[in-house]
Amino acid sequence: MKIKLVSDLHLEFSDCFINNNEGADVLILGGDIMIAQDLHDHHAADFNPYSNGALADLSRKMQRVARFRDFFKRCSFQFPHVIYIMGNHEFYNGKFYAGIDYMREEVAKYPNIYMLEQDTKIIDDVVFVGGTLWTNMNKRDPLTMHAIEGMMNDFRIIRNDKRNYAAMSALDVAIRHDKTLGYIKLIVEEHKDKK
């Protein structure tokens, strides 16, 4: 099985064309591909004509969403299987759990694109397991968690929709890391006799 891995495309800034000249069976989109919130925000119902710069903002979001969807169509057409794993940037300007839902809804439109967020996909007897792994914050070290919250954009622009939309915290990220890592270890153990 041939696997092609790409990440950090940041389609919110410009388009990117991925070809399959290698004849890969699986394309893995390994995070920081797009912003999930844009898939939700571009709807006309969200448009406020009285806000400053609203038309330009709506137009930019619509262009980004069109770019995201064209990218997915091209990937779906060129590769027999596409695995999508969200990175931290997918959650920017949005809500953590809702962002996962927006991406699942979008990916479900393509029969050969699979999102792995504490999920497993078996392709030709090969087990793929994945999820956004985040970080354990140096084993939840309080000094690390305090310092990192002041330094990284993630903790200013990602909201935790299970905590009254408060900003994501270092503890939120460490908890999610532990859950995802636990899931991956469980699946690896369950499928230890497989590829």
Show the residue positions of the predicted features:
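Short catalytic/ligand-binding loop motif for oxyanion handling, primarily in non-cytosolic enzymes
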Residues: A36-Q37, Y92-G94, I123-F128, N136-K139
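Active-site-proximal loop/helix segment associated with metal-binding centers of metalloenzymes
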Residues: V129-K194
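Beta-strand-turn-beta hairpins that frame and shape the catalytic cleft
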Residues: M1-K4, T120-G130
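Short amphipathic alpha-helices and their capping/turn segments at secondary-structure boundaries
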Residues: S14-E22, D70-S76, M115-D124, Y183-K194
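Glycine/small-residue-rich loop that forms an oxyanion/phosphate-binding "nest" at active or ligand-binding sites
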Residues: Y97-L116
